[in-house]
Curated annotation (Swiss-Prot):
GO cellular component terms given for this protein: periplasmic space
Name of the molecule in the record: Inhibitor of vertebrate lysozyme
Disulfide feature: C83-C88
Compartments (UniProt record): Periplasm
Function as written in the Swiss-Prot or TrEMBL entry: Strong inhibitor of lysozyme C.
Pfam families per record: Ivy (PF08816)
Organism: Pseudomonas aeruginosa (strain ATCC 15692 / DSM 22644 / CIP 104116 / JCM 14847 / LMG 12228 / 1C / PRS 101 / PAO1)
Keyword Disulfide bond: yes
InterPro entries, per database record: Inhibitor_vert_lysozyme_sf (IPR036501), Inhibitor_vertebrate_lysozyme (IPR014453)
Keyword list, A-Z: Disulfide bond, Periplasm, Signal
Amino acid sequence: MNGVSRLLSLALLGAALHWAPAQAEEQPRLFELLGQPGYKATWHAMFKGESDVPKWVSDASGPSSPSTSLSLEGQPYVLANSCKPHDCGNNRLLVAFRGDKSAAYGLQVSLPDEPAEVMQTPSKYATYRWYGEPSRQVRELLMKQLESDPNWK
C-alpha cells in the first residue's frame, strides 16, 4: 500500500469512526419513546376524556423524526412529533413530554385538501386540537416547534 492509499484508508476509517458515534447518539423517535418505561402511561393519560381521537394519533403510527430535549422554565421536556401516514403535509402531531414523564401534551394540526393556496400559507387554513391541557407556556413551545418548519407560513 503506497502512502496516498494508506492516507486515504486512514481518512475513511477516521470518518467512519466519527460517523458511528454520531448515529448512536440520535434521539429516539416518538414510537421509540413510547416503548420506554413511563412514556406509554403518560401518552395514554394525555387522551383521557378525549373523544374521536384519530387512530394515527392515538397509536403514534405515523412517521416521525428524532426527539429533542430542552428546558422550559427550569423543567426539562422531550419534544417529539409524528404525522399521518401518507398525508404528512396535512396532518401533524407535536408532543411535549415532561422530563420526569409525569405529563404529556399534544398539538394536532390539520389542513384541508382545498383550496390550492393551503400549502402556500398553511397557518391561514390550519385547525388545531390540543391534548393533555397544556399550559400557555407549553402551548407556545409547541407552536414555536410548528413555526420552526420552513414550510410553515
